[in-house]
Regions:
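Post-transcriptional modification and biogenesis factors for structured RNAs
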Residues: 8-19, 23-194
Length: 194
């Protein structure tokens, strides 16, 4: 809600305790939209997390990490994959899903799963919605999917393929949500030389 009320541009810096260290997060609070929320439930591969952080930086999405993680957030592979975009990403971590729901008021959520009956393009994404993605090897927990059955969507693919890469799935879904919202606060034009 705080981000939706910001009308003038300023930078905000927070210190976030991660394990034994402090991760300094600096992000631009100039956006007037609530922003999308990417929720990674027990991600295992640091490079995926870094790539997803870069997608968040480019789109203004907030990144939520649900523990246990398969890596240390300060891992070099995470930082390398996110390049020099970390200062543009708001990252919040949680002990578990219960901790996440206790700390967030989720008005709309979509759970991405290969088991879902309908396509992610059939969903109507609202500003501030939460997009849940499971761990690379197992996806979201079955009981979680059962509890949120009406919010489950999938990315279509060939039947012989098990799944898409996690960071690719996040990017595909985030950009569909942003397309439906008319790419708020994003530059959708460029200038070619010559």
């Amino acid at each position: 809600m705080f981000f939706g009320l910001i009308l003038q541009k300023f930078w905000h810096t927070i210190d976030h305790e991660v394990g034994a260290g402090i991760l300094r997060l600096r992000f631009n609070c100039s956006e007037v939209m609530k922003m999308l929320n990417i929720v990674l439930v027990e991600p295992e591969i640091p490079q995926n997390c870094g790539n997803i952080a870069r997608t968040c930086a480019a789109t203004g999405a907030r990144l939520h990490l649900i523990r246990p993680l398969g890596f240390d957030i300060s891992d070099k592979a995470v930082k390398r994959a996110g390049l020099d975009y970390w200062h543009l990403v708001e990252v919040i971590d949680y002990e578990n899903l219960e901790d996440f729901f206790a700390r967030n008021q989720v008005e709309q959520m979509w759970c991405l799963s290969t088991k879902a009956p309908r396509s992610y393009t059939e969903a109507t994404y609202q500003d501030g919605c939460y997009l849940f993605f499971g761990k690379e090897t197992k996806g979201l927990p079955e009981d979680f999917l059962d509890a949120h059955r009406d919010s489950c969507v999938r990315i279509p693919m060939r039947e012989c393929a098990r799944s898409l890469n996690l960071s690719n799935s996040v990017a595909i879904t985030v950009y569909e949500a942003l397309r439906q919202l008319s790419f708020p606060s994003l530059t959708d034009y460029g200038k070619m030389r010559g």
